[in-house]
């Protein structure tokens, strides 16, 4: 490229200061420099004013021409000398053929101790090599580092906000338990603080749509809802159908675009036509649930604005409206532990649901019904058999029907439950059979596949995960992971297999990891150690059977196979069964 003072040599050759200030574009994204000798201020993309070049800022009293004026002149009178391998042309007119090399006037090679020629015609006092080497050092080590630093800063600035959200995944204030990415909609994730404004899902098929359950009604999505909220939405809201339409007509029309979901209880397609409560006449509105979200998106793209039996229909993603928007109740509702408000809430009636109350299994309705009702008072959907209490004790079934119709999970889920001995479920999850806030062997939890426990109790479950534990208790589960747990004996942890935050055989993550306690550990495979405790033998930060921070016989350390520990009997920094200075030190140099 022409007139380019390029760093094509990746720091091998430095562009020395050009006597005539040609504003060559510098190849590492640096702004082109032009110099004060021609009335142009030095411009640098790094905010540097190369003050060391004060001796180069020639006062060109006799030459007020612009830089372009020099391009048209033969520069033979300037005693240019190409140095070593730079190979610049003497003539700027031919500089276009130099392939990225800059035309340089009296330009020494990188590291060459030459002083510049005194140009009597230009009254230039050129700096010696001392100044030049200082410039080279700055230009080489600082300018390029500046570029890297600024590019990193720019990169970080783009991601800082998102990263902050990710950091709060299990965060102090973030009660989006089980939620991927800080209470998103993964594995039953709730809104960011778990109490969010009516958009959080209560669990479901790994963050499935907020369809099935809760005390809400459907409506069109508002402008405040972002497009990303619909990535798992498989239900559409249709308006303008007309009064004399039937579910069969709606089904025939929309099944052209995808498979309409079937209610497993009734065997009917999941299509709900709305009627006016006062007149009983159809409102011309309906919801249609497809088997998969892409079909719903395709139905919106294709049918929105199309004609249906002589009427132009409007098709959009369905969203639920809270009870107070439908003219409902007092807006009571408790908000503890993320609150019911974010999950479809019960604020319409105020307070907690009573024993025996049940959620309509119709995904287009989701109305909460009194225990005495045998059909939904909104859509007349028959009451599921498994929602009926047995023996006067309704404790074991949670708030929802079979698997909550929340796509493998739900508000209560199969075998759900709020508490008590062997209390069944929890807020969601497939066979989230533990759950409950407390009680002996409280199996389930807020969500996840077969999520074991709950807030506490023996063999307590957890917020999510596979057979996850709970906040405490023997063999407690945890936020996620297999048999995880927050604390207690054999407690699980935030994630991992049999992880745990504390307690006996606890773990923060990993396989049988533990944060502290007996056989605790920070992570790793069977990392039995941890921050302290008796036989804190394995753990450490990671590795297979790696050590731990302290405790008696704390075998481990930061990593490695059966690595040592930070302190305690048989301790050590790392290595295979290693102490700090034992005879196996030759094994410590191998990579972990």
Curated annotation (Swiss-Prot):
Biased composition (Low complexity): 1-21, 28-91, 104-129, 140-150
Entry's Gene Ontology molecular function annotations: DNA binding; mRNA 3'-UTR binding; RNA binding; transcription coregulator activity; zinc ion binding
Keywords per UniProt: Acetylation, ADP-ribosylation, Chromosomal rearrangement, Cytoplasm, DNA-binding, Isopeptide bond, Metal-binding, Methylation, Nucleus, Phosphoprotein, Proto-oncogene, Repeat, RNA-binding, Ubl conjugation, Zinc, Zinc-finger
Single GO cellular component term: cytoplasm
UniProt modified residues of type Asymmetric dimethylarginine: 206, 528, 535, 570
A GO BP annotation: RNA splicing
Cross-link entry Glycyl lysine isopeptide (Lys-Gly) (interchain with G-Cter in SUMO2), positions: 265, 268
Domain RRM: residue ranges: 234-320
UniProt modification remark: Dimethylated by PRMT1 at Arg-206 to asymmetric dimethylarginine. The methylation may favor nuclear localization and positive regulation of TAF15 transcriptional activity. ADP-ribosylated during genotoxic stress.
Keyword Endoplasmic reticulum belongs to the record: no
Associated clinical condition: A chromosomal aberration involving TAF15/TAF2N is found in a form of extraskeletal myxoid chondrosarcomas (EMC). Translocation t(9;17)(q22;q11) with NR4A3.
Oligomeric form and interacting partners: Belongs to the RNA polymerase II (Pol II) transcriptional multiprotein complex, together with the TATA-binding protein (TBP) and other TBP-associated factors (TAF(II)s). Binds SF1.
Protein name: TATA-binding protein-associated factor 2N
């Amino acid at each position: 490229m022409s007139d380019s003072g390029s760093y094509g040599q990746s720091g091998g050759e430095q562009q020395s200061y050009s006597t005539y200030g040609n504003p060559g574009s510098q190849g590492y994204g640096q702004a082109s420099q032009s110099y004060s000798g021609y009335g142009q201020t030095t411009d640098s993309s790094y905010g540097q004013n190369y003050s060391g070049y004060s001796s180069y800022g020639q006062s060109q009293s006799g030459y007020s021409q612009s830089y372009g004026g020099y391009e048209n002149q033969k520069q033979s009178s300037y005693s240019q000398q190409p140095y070593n391998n730079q190979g610049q042309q003497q003539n700027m007119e031919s500089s276009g053929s130099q392939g990225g090399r800059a035309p340089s006037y009296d330009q020494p090679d990188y590291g060459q101790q030459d002083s510049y020629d005194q140009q009597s015609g230009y009254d230039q006092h050129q700096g010696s090599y001392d100044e030049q080497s200082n410039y080279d050092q700055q230009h080489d080590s600082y300018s390029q580092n500046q570029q890297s630093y600024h590019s990193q800063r720019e990169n970080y600035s783009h991601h800082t906000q998102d990263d902050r959200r990710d950091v709060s995944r299990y965060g102090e204030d973030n009660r989006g338990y089980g939620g991927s990415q800080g209470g998103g909609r993964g594995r039953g994730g709730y809104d960011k603080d778990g109490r969010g404004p009516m958009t959080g899902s209560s669990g479901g098929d790994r963050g499935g749509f907020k369809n099935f359950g809760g005390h809400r009604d459907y409506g069109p999505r508002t402008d405040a809802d972002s497009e990303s909220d619909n990535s798992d939405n498989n239900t559409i809201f249709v308006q303008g159908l007309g009064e004399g339409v039937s579910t069969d007509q709606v089904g025939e029309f929309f099944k052209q675009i995808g498979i309409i979901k079937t209610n497993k209880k009734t065997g009917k397609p999941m299509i709900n036509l709305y009627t006016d409560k006062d007149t009983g006449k159809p409102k011309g509105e309906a919801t249609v649930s497809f088997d998969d979200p892409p079909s719903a998106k395709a139905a919106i793209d294709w049918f929105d604005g199309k004609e249906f039996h002589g009427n132009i229909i409007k098709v959009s993603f369905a969203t639920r409206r809270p009870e107070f928007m439908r003219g409902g109740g007092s807006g009571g509702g408790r908000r503890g532990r993320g609150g019911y408000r974010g999950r479809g809430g019960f604020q319409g009636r105020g307070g907690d649901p009573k024993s025996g109350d049940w959620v309509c299994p119709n995904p287009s309705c989701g109305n909460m019904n009194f225990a005495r009702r045998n059909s939904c008072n909104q859509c007349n959907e028959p009451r599921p058999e498994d929602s009926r209490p047995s023996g006067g004790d309704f404790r074991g079934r949670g708030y929802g029907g079979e698997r909550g119709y929340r796509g493998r999970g739900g508000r209560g889920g199969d075998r759900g439950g709020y508490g008590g001995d062997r209390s069944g479920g929890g807020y969601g999850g497939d066979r989230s059979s533990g759950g409950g806030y407390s009680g002996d062997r409280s199996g389930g939890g807020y969500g996840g596949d077969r999520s074991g426990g709950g807030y506490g109790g023996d063999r307590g479950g957890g917020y999510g995960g596979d057979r996850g534990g709970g906040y405490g208790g023997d063999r407690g589960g945890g936020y996620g992971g297999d048999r995880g747990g927050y604390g207690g004996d054999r407690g699980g942890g935030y994630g991992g297999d049999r992880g745990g935050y504390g307690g006996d055989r606890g773990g923060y993550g990993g396989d049988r990891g533990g944060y502290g306690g007996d056989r605790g550990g920070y992570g790793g495979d069977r990392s039995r150690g941890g921050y302290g405790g008796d036989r804190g033998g394995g753990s450490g930060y990671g590795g297979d059977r790696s050590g731990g921070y302290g405790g008696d016989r704390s075998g481990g350390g930061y990593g490695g196979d059966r690595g040592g520990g930070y302190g305690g009997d048989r301790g050590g920094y790392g290595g295979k069964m290693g102490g700090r200075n034992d005879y196996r030190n030759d094994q410590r140099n191998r990579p972990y």
